[in-house]
UniProtKB/Swiss-Prot annotation:
This is dCTP deaminase, dUMP-forming. It catalyses: dCTP + 2 H2O = dUMP + NH4(+) + diphosphate. The lineage of its organism: Bacteria, Bacillati, Actinomycetota, Actinomycetes, Mycobacteriales. It comes from the Bacteria. The keyword Hydrolase applies.
């Protein structure tokens, strides 16, 4: 069940669903707007000949932190990792779904490539997979509304929520745009 604005506020007031910093003006009829942080991960195209999800490639991306008032320009065809300004903590019976903003989609900005689902039990900043599919550069401003989080109530609490020992959670507690840890999904034969 998708939570309404009243349900979202009730969960926040009860302390079960946490957003930091919380701004009540970001609550929409059935979602919460999320804002862009000032940190980005850019790909180092000259360090690797290709991306291999099975290998740890520590220098594949570099962290860029903007100075106050400075924008990030995402060029046509460009892809960069960003993150939400807000830190989210979901209880064991709520999950999230990150969606783009219609106004930005109409400009050619995609907020996430594939990973829009947030498991119950997650705590951290949400990493954004930002792509420019327009034919002109797009200016990204820290603090701007970049997407919206829909919150869904599970039929029962998760038995093994995100962050539990058996869940294999790789991104619990992440701060800023976190690079892929896909290599952890591959079994090492040593």
């Amino acid at each position: 069940m998708l939570l309404s604005d009243r349900d979202l506020r009730a969960e926040i007031t009860a302390g079960r669903f946490s957003i930091d910093p919380f701004d009540d003006t970001l609550v929409q009829p059935s979602s919460i707007d999320v804002r862009l942080d000032c940190m980005f991960r850019v790909f180092n195209n000259t360090r690797y000949t290709h991306i291999d999800p099975a290998r740890q490639q520590d220098e594949l991306t570099s962290l860029v932190e903007l100075v106050d008032g400075e924008p990030f320009v995402l060029h046509p065809g460009g892809f960069v990792l960003g993150s939400t300004l807000e830190l989210f903590t979901l209880p064991e019976d709520l999950a999230g779904r990150l969606e783009g903003k219609s106004s930005l989609g109409r400009l050619g900005l995609l907020t996430h490539s594939t990973a829009g689902f947030i498991d119950p039990g997650f705590c951290g900043h949400i990493t954004l997979e930002l792509s420019n599919v327009a034919n002109l550069p797009i200016t990204l401003w820290p603090g701007m509304k970049i997407g919206q989080l829909c919150v869904l109530r599970l039929t029962s609490p998760a038995e093994h929520p995100y962050g539990s020992a058996s869940a294999g959670s790789k991104y619990q507690g992440q701060r800023g745009p976190t690079p892929s840890r896909s290599y952890e999904n591959f079994i090492k034969n040593t």
